[in-house]
Amino acid sequence: MEDEQPDSLEGWVPVREGLFAEPERHRLRFLVAWNGAEGKFAVTCHDRTAQQRRLREGARLGPEPEPKPEAAVSPSSWAGLLSAAGLRGAHRQLAALWPPLERCFPRLPPELDVGGGGAWGLGLGLWALLWPTRAGPGEAALQELCGQLERYLGAAADGCGGATVRDALFPAEGGAADCESPREFRERALRARWVEADARLRQVIQGHGKANTMVALMNVYQEEDEAYQELVTVATMFFQYLLQPFRAMREVATLCKLDILKSLDEDDLGPRRVVALEKEAEEWTRRAEEAVVSIQDITVNYFKETVKALAGMQKEMEQDAKRFGQAAWATAIPRLEKLQLMLARETLQLMRAKELCLNHKRAEIQGKMEDLPEQEKNTNVVDELEIQFYEIQLELYEVKFEILKNEEILLTTQLDSLKRLIKEKQDEVVYYDPCENPEELKVIDCVVGLQDDKNLEVKELRRQCQQLESKRGRICAKRASLRSRKDQCKENHRFRLQQAEESIRYSRQHHSIQMKRDKIKEEEQKKKEWINQERQKTLQRLRSFKDKRLAQSVRNTSGSEPVAPNLPSDLSQQMCLPASHAVSVIHPSSRKTRGVPLSEAGNVKSPKCQNCHGNIPVQVFVPVGDQTHSKSSEELSLPPPPPPPPPPPPPPPPPPPPLRALSSSSQAATHQNLGFRAPVKDDQPRPLVCESPAERPRDSLESFSCPGSMDEVLASLRHGRAPLRKVEVPAVRPPHASINEHILAAIRQGVKLKKVHPDLGPNPSSKPTSNRRTSDLERSIKAALQRIKRVSADSEEDSDEQDPGQWDG
């Protein structure tokens, strides 16, 4: 009874292996310093041995070693804050283990204990004000004390061991170092038993070559079968132990989900509680699915181990068949057939477990695709998910081919066994002896009955062979159908990959074009900003110039400056007139103004200005669309108001001829100096148009970008003359204009109509862009799902799917 293994580990404490082994000596380096803010000693311990070992391993593995989990990497440095009382307590523990340390511990001043009570806070400060304590040791004394503590800790590590000193100074968090959790202990024990059974089986398999006779080989086969059974038993226990927490989680998650659904159906809950319960149900569903996935993965790993063991046994047995003759090997044929059946069954189980995993992945991708409109509005994600689905579907087809292959192996093995039995039955020889008595004939009748029974057995075996042949034919038909579906899936996968490559190439090409466009736009924006900055600088220079030269500009406008040589005398005098002189504006939109001769056009002038010398009325024709521009340019072109005019000059000469009578040469010079284009026809007025910079010489001071610009105003101020500007004159209404005439005038001018898009109703093109994108995304998702359903319509829908338990016989 004492040697029996306990069924439960209740009340047992698992102890780590090698607990009392001789520990490795580590070279420790201690650093001690006084922390005045905390009133404690800062102690640091470095394991030089572990650090050097780690450096050597890093140099051996290369520049990029594989990362290890944090739990597997032991620390090589420790640090902590210890008060004077804490150091005395650690000294008492270490001195109890090694008495020579008693005289090595340095004397700590009592003032350090007071400094270590900084945690008392305000209360200690008040007591310190009432009864001030003595000053602590100086800086040199503290450094000497820290050096003594370093030497003491080094001696303690040599005498008591580095692990003991570390535990005394830096208590480790967690459980005791000599114990481990029961689950880890049991898992480690089962894994060790499984590894041991696997090693024993491999050792037996390697001993086949030592058997020189068939009898010895059969003994090896028997020992091998026992080793395999032990391996299967231990592996089953180990993997069942691994499956236990996931099965418990699946059961708990399913029960909690059912309870929540029952509560939602039966209880009267508020909306917030309903939302919370629905989220909790989704969380339990997710946990159950994760547990199922883990169970499937562990199952796949178990069958991988059994298949690997059986494959090794079968391969070694096939090698043994080459060493013996056919008659001697006939005794081992049943075991070979049994191994083939076992390997086929285990492979079927492995492939079906893989099929479950792939089906879960496929369903997960399909669920992501169906829930995509609520997550991401991107068609490229749909294409990527579809490509992933095709890849998993191709893997699933490969698994199904393996399943059909192993099913066919099962059928072929059973057919070979039945054919061998039929041949043995047919090859049986019956010898008949001559009969001398009639009674012996009765015995012959019994023998004939036995012969008939043998024929019935042969017929039954042949019927079973026919059934297996029909199953084999159905498997071949399934394989052909599956191959066609696989080819279709490959074609779809190749087509989608080609589309993805084309879209990537197209996007890269257009991305480069868009980058060029963005670069050009950025350069244009920078150019505009630079122009605006230069314009602001010019305006600032103009303002400063006008402020400095205000007096001189006033004298120039009063006629003290010489006339510009490029203008005629009359026109130059006209440009030097004060701002009170009127300028008549003729709009080409007015029909009455077009019909009046140029000399008789309406111009507003004061009586005093009519008698002045050289007063020539200037008529500027402004189109209707330029009225706004004239308003904006008026602010820049107007010079400051001049002072009162000087005394009148001597009597003027006879009045000059009208503007129409000017010579063509003077008109050309005037238009050239003003920078305007001459009218095309003399009988029809034209608006003054600014010349382009390309049509004028760059070195001319009078030719600038447009009339009224900053450069032109600056040049005019320098030469003491004001440029012509467009002035908006309000249209003079007739004195007795009726409402009907206004209406008729508006009708003549016309009304600009807006382009109205007709409402097309339920036409999808009239929907917003977001709705169109959403509909396009939904259509692409539906089309992808339809293609996926066509591809995934495989042998699962067949009604004659064979049950794995059918091949157990």
UniProtKB/Swiss-Prot annotation:
Cite the GO molecular-function annotations of the record: actin binding; Arp2/3 complex binding; microtubule binding; small GTPase binding
Q: Where does the record place a coiled coil? A: 271-298, 384-479, 512-542, 770-797
UniProt keyword terms in alphabetical order = Actin-binding, Coiled coil, Cytoplasm, Cytoplasmic vesicle, Golgi apparatus, Membrane, Microtubule, Phosphoprotein, Repeat
What InterPro entries does this protein map onto? JMY/WHAMM, JMY/WHAMM_N, WH2_dom
Location comes to: Cytoplasm; Endoplasmic reticulum-Golgi intermediate compartment; Cytoplasmic vesicle membrane; Golgi apparatus, cis-Golgi network
Name the Pfam families on file.
Answer: JMY (PF15871), WHAMM-JMY_N (PF15920)
Q: Which domain of life is it from?
A: Eukaryota
Kindly give the PROSITE patterns that the UniProt entry links to this protein: WH2
Compositional bias, Acidic residues, is annotated for 794-803
Record field: compositional bias (Pro residues): 638-659
Q: What is known of its domains?
A: The N-terminal region associates with membranes, the coiled-coil region binds to microtubules and the WH2 domains promotes actin nucleation.
Oligomeric and partner information: Interacts with ACTR3; indicative for an association with the ARP2/3 complex. Associates with microtubules; in vitro binds to tubulin heterodimer in a 1:1 stoichiometry; decorates microtubules with a repeat of 80 A along protofilaments. Interacts with RHOD (in GTP-bound form).
Q: What is this protein called?
A: WASP homolog-associated protein with actin, membranes and microtubules
Q: Which organism is it from?
A: Homo sapiens (Human)
Q: Which gene encodes it?
A: WHAMM
